[in-house]
Curated annotation (Swiss-Prot):
SUPFAM superfamilies cross-referenced by the UniProt entry: Urease metallochaperone UreE, C-terminal domain (SSF69737), Urease metallochaperone UreE, N-terminal domain (SSF69287)
Gene name per UniProt: ureE
Keyword Nucleotide-binding tagged: no
Region span, Disordered: 170-205
A GO BP entry: protein folding
Cross-referenced InterPro entries: UreE, UreE_C_dom, UreE_N, UreE_N_sf
The keyword Glycosyltransferase is assigned to this record: no
Record field: transmembrane: none
SMART domains membership: UreE_N
Native species: Burkholderia pseudomallei (strain 668)
Function of the molecule: Involved in urease metallocenter assembly. Binds nickel. Probably functions as a nickel donor during metallocenter assembly.
Chief place where the protein resides: cytoplasm
GO function term, MF aspect, one: nickel cation binding
Name this polypeptide is given: Urease accessory protein UreE
């Protein structure tokens, strides 16, 4: 069995024909987060994936096997939720609550994509978003899953937060509420990079 133990850095340019001829390793997101994995190439060949710990593979990555051969990574179709909203404010609130729960999210133009989760689907629907189950490749934003506590200062935000907590309490039977009230205004703008095409900010007043 061949061992795949190296990933070529994204800034290294390879001939397109060379990459196209390489066999594909098609993996769902959960499998792409594992540095040790027994996998099967699309050709049917079994391989062992042994990469540095903490490696998260992305669609289009090129790997190198122990015999020097190339293998290209492809994101598999998997069960996901497509989240849309009638306005930017609702979608932003949905994104906030997903981020507050450390949920990996792929950001698109007017749409959020996350791994299928019926609890999150229920929460997002109650927040006013439209949630559709689909089968699609999932490639969330890299390195953007920091957690956080609520810093809302307006009644509408507090209602949204309480609703989100209620949904999770119903499903899990206990509360994880983290409330921090302040007497001063503050504003935290978080730019989400070039993939965030709809100018997604988290501003709190």
């Amino acid at each position: 069995m061949r061992t795949i133990d190296k990933r070529i850095a994204p800034n290294v340019r390879l001939a397109a024909t060379l990459v196209a001829r390489a066999p594909a390793l098609t993996l769902a997101y959960d499998a792409r987060c594992k540095s040790r994995l027994a996998a099967t190439l699309d050709t049917g060949e079994d391989v062992a994936l042994v990469l540095p710990r903490g490696t998260v593979l992305r669609d289009g990555d090129v790997l190198v096997a122990d015999d020097g051969a190339l293998v290209r990574v492809a994101a598999a179709h998997e069960a996901v939720l497509l989240v849309r909203a009638p306005d930017a404010l609702t979608l932003t609130r949905a994104a906030y609550h997903l981020g507050n729960r450390h949920t990996p999210v792929e950001v698109g133009a007017g749409c959020l994509k996350l791994e299928y989760d019926p609890v999150l689907a229920d929460m997002l629907t109650r927040l006013g978003a439209t949630v559709e189950r689909a089968s699609a490749p999932f490639q969330p934003e890299a390195g953007a899953y920091g957690g956080g506590h609520r810093h809302g200062h307006d009644a509408t935000f507090a209602e949204d937060y309480a609703l989100a907590q209620q949904v999770f309490d119903e499903h899990h039977g206990h509360s994880h509420s983290h409330s921090h009230d302040h007497d001063h205004d503050h504003d935290h703008d978080h730019q989400h990079g070039p993939c965030c095409s709809h100018g997604h900010h988290h501003g709190h007043r």
